[in-house]
Design a protein with these regions (language model features):
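N-terminal signal-anchor/start-transfer transmembrane helix
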Residues: 17-32, 104, 233
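Alpha-helical transmembrane segments and their helix-start/interface "positive-inside/aromatic belt" motifs
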Residues: 36-49, 175-185, 376-385, 467-481, ...
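Hard-cation-handling environments
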Residues: 463-530
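Hydrophobic transmembrane alpha-helices and their helix-loop junctions in integral membrane proteins
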Residues: 105-146, 155-465, 489
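Aromatic-capped, Gly/Pro-kinked transmembrane alpha-helices
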Residues: 494-515, 536-636
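Transmembrane helix-loop-helix hairpins at membrane boundaries of multipass inner-membrane proteins
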Residues: 1-13, 30-125, 197-218, 222, ...
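Alpha-helical transmembrane segments and their membrane-interface junctions
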Residues: 390-406, 480-499, 570, 576-577
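Membrane-entry segments of alpha-helical transmembrane domains in multi-pass membrane proteins
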Residues: 5-19, 35-43, 81-98, 136-149, ...
Length: 636
């Protein structure tokens, strides 16, 4: 249904919640940037109101029957009509709440983490810009509006990743993220263009309807679905566009929590879910997506097994879990994919924010060094990070256990068992690399007595040691830990909320395979046990089985040489082709044109040189001949 915003408090709340962060961004950049504390207050207040609006909308419309829309004319050209506005349904209400909630907690945490940073006000301005773009994208009624704010999310992410722009590595990481996600966005745009030209409409509800099959052939739907999925691959770091995400750790740690939990990188998965019925109309495309998600999940898991950087471990785990979400959706398990996105938002934000406390206190990203300097002495962060790692590993009764089991159940419904076995292998690897990190901090080989904050921060330019703000950073951890503990028990209400109104979303199937639950948990516990043997028990070498195999360790540490392949491709194919093209153009067109003009001028001069013989009689004859011709022209 369509309503006017001033008559409907629902749409008023939607507009207020989405637009306030933009107002905050403008106020900070134009007026309050010289006043850091005031800027932070404005930003936190704005996102607080956004969270209140999102929660009120979710509660008010928990039993929503039909999507609520408010639209106005945006683009009108001939038969083309593109509206701009808001659409509220079960999926957008849930995602809006997640984005607002994580944004609020990250901004509160940042009051302690970023205190004293020279770019404090600028940081909160970019946080507000990001929140506005993400929330407005979430409730977009058309894919064109979705795409516009999708690009704004990418721009805001670039600003946040490259926040420490004076550092070369941070600047390069921001550019890499921006360029690699643009590659996927080009395919996304071409896919939307294909739908628009053949279907004539980019309204999300219309794209998800059965009518599209009458206007587009199966081949066209498959092609457009694959192209649109390019955007998912770029934003959600799916193979082969996955290597930018670990480098995005160059931004401040709270930024990592924001990007990796429920916002930028989850935007791709959200888009997959947003037009899930459209994608489902092409079984071929869904099989391709399933393969991409599986490859991504396994590759990222292996990369996480050898790194010593605490933020990179969780970055690789993000890529892997996004692969799990894509697998769930591509297997037809609409609810399982969204449920894992929801639970992942909580425990992944918790993992990064806990890591930020360790980095803040010890000035290093190396988790072996954190353990060596007494990381287990920080009681709240160590308890919370262990809890979140257990949720990431899929251990009961934490939220990650329930959502992973839903995905495994969906994979078990597929006729080919290879997808399920790949998922189970991923569960084992996830538990192993997660507790490799936990045990390295809890049970270091040696301990140095170091007072908190004694180290100079050399990780990502984050030298902010303000012990008095410890509890400002700790409260968001406690809230997220509570969410991680209880969220899984709300699986049934959430499933009724989402799937009860979503056609074709069945098939998560977790309850039909009791044996699968035991196998999955058993494999996760096996991963924890292996990590304990290698890193936790007394006298452990703290060298993993992969690290003992030097060629394999190098392969994983070099990220399967994917970046090297891209560099070779750029240097020898792209640069080579264009270099030869421009060289040939320079030599044959530009040089040839100039040289040809010179030769023509010289040749013409030689041809006319007989006119300048140097004889007076000849010159007089030519002069009189010209005068005679002029006279004939004028008089006759």
């Amino acid at each position: 249904m369509t309503s006017s915003w001033f008559q409907d408090p629902t749409l008023l709340a939607a507009m207020l919640g989405a637009l306030l962060p933009f107002v905050s961004f403008v106020l900070i950049m134009v007026f309050t940037r010289p006043y850091p504390k005031l800027s932070a207050t404005i930003s936190v207040a704005a996102v607080s109101v956004s969270l209140i609006c999102a929660l009120s909308l979710l509660g008010r419309h928990w039993h929503l029957e039909q999507p609520i829309q408010y639209t106005a004319k945006w683009l009108v050209s001939g038969k083309l009509y593109v509206p701009f506005g808001f659409m509220l349904d079960q999926l957008s209400l849930l995602m809006l709440t997640i984005v607002a909630g994580i944004s609020f907690l990250v901004q509160v945490y940042s009051l302690g983490y970023m205190a004293g940073d020279p770019g404090f006000a600028r940081y909160y301005a970019f946080q507000s810009l990001f929140a506005w773009a993400m929330m407005t994208m979430t409730i977009a009624p058309t894919m064109l509006q979705f795409y516009v704010f999708w690009e704004l999310v990418g721009l805001a992410s670039y600003f946040l990743i490259g926040f420490y722009y004076e550092k070369f590595s941070a600047s390069e990481a921001g550019k890499k993220a921006f360029v690699m996600t643009r590659l996927g966005d080009i395919a996304f745009f071409l896919g939307l263009l294909l739908v628009l030209l053949n279907f004539g409409n980019l309204n999300i509800l219309d794209m998800n309807s059965v009518d599209i099959t009458a206007r587009m052939s199966p081949a066209l739907i498959t092609l457009s679905a694959i192209l649109i999925f390019g955007g998912v691959a770029g934003k959600s770091a799916q193979f082969p566009l996955l290597t930018w995400l670990p480098d995005a750790m160059e931004g401040p740690t709270p930024v990592s929590a924001l990007l990796h939990s429920a916002t930028m990188v989850a935007a791709g998965v959200y888009m997959f879910a947003r037009i899930f019925p459209f994608f489902s109309k092409s079984p071929t495309a869904m099989t391709i997506f399933l393969a991409i998600g599986t490859i991504t999940m396994l590759l990222a898991s292996t990369m996480a097994m050898v790194t010593r950087d605490i933020k990179q471990v969780w970055a690789f785990s993000t890529i892997s879990q996004l692969g799990f979400m894509v697998m769930g959706l591509a297997a037809g398990s609409y609810f399982a994919g969204i449920f894992h996105l929801t639970t992942h938002a909580g425990f992944k934000a918790l993992l990064f924010l806990c890591s930020g406390v360790f980095i803040h206190e010890y000035g290093t990203n190396d988790f072996f060094e954190i353990g060596k300097h007494g990381g287990r002495g920080l009681k709240v962060p160590i308890v919370c990070i262990t809890l979140a790692a257990a949720a990431l590993s899929g251990l009961p009764p934490l939220s990650g256990f329930f959502s992973k089991e839903a995905i495994m159940g969906g994979l078990a419904e597929l006729p080919n068992p290879i997808w399920l076995w790949a998922g189970l292998l991923g569960a084992f690897l996830t538990a192993y690399y997660s507790f490799r990190l936990i045990f390295a901090i809890l049970f270091p080989k040696e301990i140095e007595e170091v007072h908190h904050g004694e180290h100079g921060g050399h990780g990502h330019g984050e030298d902010h040691h303000h012990a008095g703000l410890y509890w400002v950073m700790a409260w968001p951890l406690i809230i997220l830990a509570a969410v991680t503990l209880v969220l899984g028990f709300f699986q049934t209400p959430l499933e009724n909320f989402l799937v009860g109104h979503h056609g074709g979303a069945e098939g998560h199937g977790g309850g039909h395979h009791a044996w699968l639950l035991y196998v999955a948990v058993g494999l996760a516990l096996s991963g924890v046990a292996l990590a304990w043997l290698e890193f936790g028990r007394k006298g452990a070498s703290q060298v993993g089985f992969v690290e003992r195999l030097e060629p394999v360790k190098t392969l994983f540490a070099e990220r399967w040489y994917i970046d090297h392949f891209y560099r070779l491709f750029l240097d020898y194919v792209i640069y080579g082709i264009f270099s030869n093209l421009f060289t040939r153009n320079d030599r044959q067109v530009i040089d040839g044109g100039i040289d040809g003009l010179c030769r023509a001028t010289v040749g013409g001069g030689r041809m006319l040189s007989f006119l300048q013989s140097g004889m007076l009689q000849y010159n007089l004859m030519v002069m009189f001949a010209v005068l005679a011709l002029v006279a004939l022209y004028f008089f006759f």
